[in-house]
């Protein structure tokens, strides 16, 4: 059952990532990997919220919710591999400052998003 929930969640998360990334690139252009950055920040925020909510607020079989939402949906939604290749491509193109900015913003804002999500989750 857990494998099926992970499969379904991951598929939905991947479709959501595709939609959000493409919307960001459409609105803001592709000079900076904003689509991946926004996806990873919002995914980190949701991870914090849902992690606390599932652990502290839900009763019953929390493993099912964890499999569907945390491992499945957010695993399919967030993307370290896209972040990595986009940063590599920036470096290879000689855009060292933009690559460094991408790394700094991604790490700092994703950690901040997870922290904020935990705070929000505790208030629910």
Curated annotation (Swiss-Prot):
It is found in: Cell inner membrane. One of its GO terms (biological process) is cellular detoxification of fluoride. It catalyses: fluoride(in) = fluoride(out). One of its GO terms (molecular function) is metal ion binding. The keyword Metal-binding applies. GO terms for cellular component: plasma membrane. It holds the Pfam family CRCB. Na(+) binds at residues 75, 78. InterPro entries: FluC (IPR003691). It is a multi-pass membrane protein. Na(+) is not transported, but it plays an essential structural role and its presence is essential for fluoride channel function. The chain crosses the membrane at residues 3-23, 34-54, 68-88, 100-120. Keywords: Cell inner membrane, Cell membrane, Ion channel, Ion transport, Membrane, Metal-binding, Sodium, Transmembrane, Transmembrane helix, Transport. The keyword Transport applies. Belongs to the fluoride channel Fluc/FEX (TC 1.A.43) family. HAMAP family: FluC. Fluoride-specific ion channel. Important for reducing fluoride concentration in the cell, thus reducing its toxicity. This is Fluoride-specific ion channel FluC. It comes from Coxiella burnetii (strain CbuK_Q154). The gene is fluC.
């Amino acid at each position: 059952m857990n494998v099926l929930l992970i499969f379904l969640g991951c598929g939905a998360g991947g479709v959501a990532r595709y939609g959000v990334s493409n919307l960001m690139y459409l609105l803001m252009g592709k000079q900076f990997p904003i689509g991946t950055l926004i996806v990873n920040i919002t995914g980190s925020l949701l991870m914090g919220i849902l992690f606390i909510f599932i652990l502290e607020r839900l009763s019953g079989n929390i493993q099912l919710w964890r499999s569907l939402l945390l491992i499945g949906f957010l695993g399919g939604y967030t993307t370290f591999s896209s972040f990595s290749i986009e940063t590599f491509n920036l470096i290879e193109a000689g855009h060292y400052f933009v690559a460094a900015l991408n790394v700094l913003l991604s790490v700092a804002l994703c950690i901040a998003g997870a922290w904020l999500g935990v705070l929000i989750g505790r208030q629910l």
